[in-house]
Amino acid sequence: MASQGTKRSYEQMETGGERQNATEIRASVGRMVGGIGRFYIQMCTELKLSDYEGRLIQNSITMERMVLSAFDERRNKYLEEHPSAGKDPKKTGGPIYRRRDGKWVRELILYDKEEIRRIWRQANNGEDATAGLTHLMIWHSNLNDATYQRTRALVRTGMDPRMCSLMQGSTLPRRSGAAGAAVKGVGTMVMELIRMIKRGINDRNFWRGENGRRTRIAYERMCNILKGKFQTAAQRAMMDQVRESRNPGNAEIEDLIFLARSALILRGSVAHKSCLPACVYGLAVASGYDFEREGYSLVGIDPFRLLQNSQVFSLIRPNENPAHKSQLVWMACHSAAFEDLRVSSFIRGTRIVPRGQLSTRGVQIASNENMDTMDSNTLELRSRYWAIRTRSGGNTNQQRASAGQISVQPTFSVQRNLPFERATIMAAFTGNTEGRTSDMRTEIIRMMESAKPEDVSFQGRGVFELSDEKATNPIVPSFDMSNEGSYFFGDNAEEFEN
């Protein structure tokens, strides 16, 4: 993107740093994941988990959730002020799974939030290490993106369920900061804005008074974040209109839905980061790896290399396919829920199946599920190649505007075409080009009509051997141009429920 000079890299957002050079960024990201690893090791010691139990992804998720809950200031304050039956606002916990007499048993643990905060700070040189917390949030968000569908949420806000590829980061908490904003898809931002506008329509005081002023600032900030994701002048101009509206209402909702649809072809820039479960960083730290000294990047070879050497286990329900469970977690680790399956399959070195064909449910186990029949398996998280993660939408012809596909937001910077069904997308754009945004709408539609599904994106970019850490020899894969690869076709996944 042209404005690259003014932007901080994701790693800087992630670590809250000012402008740094590459070495400093690598060191501060290393410090961040090292802190997560140290926290995890300490928690395993506190709970006296065996090596095997400490490598169980479900245990990792419980501990990640505990530390996120311990630092959730707003929710903690709310819980203090609105005491609910059976919930101690000062405590946090969750299920820990242990191996006893050849069976897995669930044990519910409860800790003081203060104690968890102490352990976390101690692992992070006495600091709050918000960046590490955000990193965990993004890992949970990526896992949700791979596991659940958001059809109901899309329909509720008046959007089309086929726009699911725009929904990256839709389950991220509000407090996820700049790093969180960078990974949110266009659809996610549109949905947040529509919810806000709808509240304003239903509640007369929403935009008024001191609170209303703060609301207005938040609204304009969200508009600017979304504007920054668009890569064409017309889309950005429309966002200015939405932002400057005196009294946002249905006209703005219409404009936003129009923009979301347009992003299926004129894709937005959405960042992708490989955020791994805490236990993976813990294993590396425990084996003596010094992340801060070695340096680390979320968008290069490092996460691939880490997964190459980590053994992580998962609980498996009786009728689940362990290979499918591994695929789900692999996609989550690389933030590849919305990537073209042809590209993901090539990188992973095994065929990745669309979600409708997976025999697996989510990774987390509900409290009412029977543990007696639970088994555990090694997750296969290794890859054949590695590739650089992208923050662009993969638009061709001078990165302005090009082919998209209902259901791809590229993760890897790898040359391919982005096939799409133009008729399907364009059908959504009948008529309505009047009103104050008419010229922009006309311009956007014109750009979409001139997009060709056979255009190549990420020209000349390839994948790399895992031995090629300096990315010197790109291997440019050739894909069957006609066969599109969306993860969501024929989808039967569960809805995400808060």
Curated annotation (Swiss-Prot):
Post-translational modification comment from the UniProt entry: Late in virus-infected cells, may be cleaved from a 56-kDa protein to a 53-kDa protein by a cellular caspase. This cleavage might be a marker for the onset of apoptosis in infected cells or have a specific function in virus host interaction.
Ranges spanned by the short sequence motif Bipartite nuclear localization signal, renumbered to the chain: 198-216
Keywords: Capsid protein, Helical capsid protein, Host nucleus, Host-virus interaction, Ribonucleoprotein, RNA-binding, Viral nucleoprotein, Viral penetration into host nucleus, Virion, Virus entry into host cell
The gene coding this protein: NP
Purpose of the protein: Encapsidates the negative strand viral RNA, protecting it from nucleases. The encapsidated genomic RNA is termed the ribonucleoprotein (RNP) and serves as template for transcription and replication. The RNP needs to be localized in the host nucleus to start an infectious cycle, but is too large to diffuse through the nuclear pore complex. NP comprises at least 2 nuclear localization signals that are responsible for the active RNP import into the nucleus through cellular importin alpha/beta pathway.
Name this protein carries in UniProt: Nucleoprotein
Subcellular location(s) per record: Virion; Host nucleus
Matching InterPro entries: Flu_NP
Quaternary structure (record): Homomultimerizes to form the nucleocapsid. May bind host exportin-1/XPO1. Binds to viral genomic RNA. Protein-RNA contacts are mediated by a combination of electrostatic interactions between positively charged residues and the phosphate backbone and planar interactions between aromatic side chains and bases.
Organism, scientific name: Influenza A virus (strain A/Silky Chicken/Hong Kong/SF189/2001 H5N1 genotype A)
UniProt-listed SUPFAM superfamilies: flu NP-like
Ribonucleoprotein in keyword set: yes
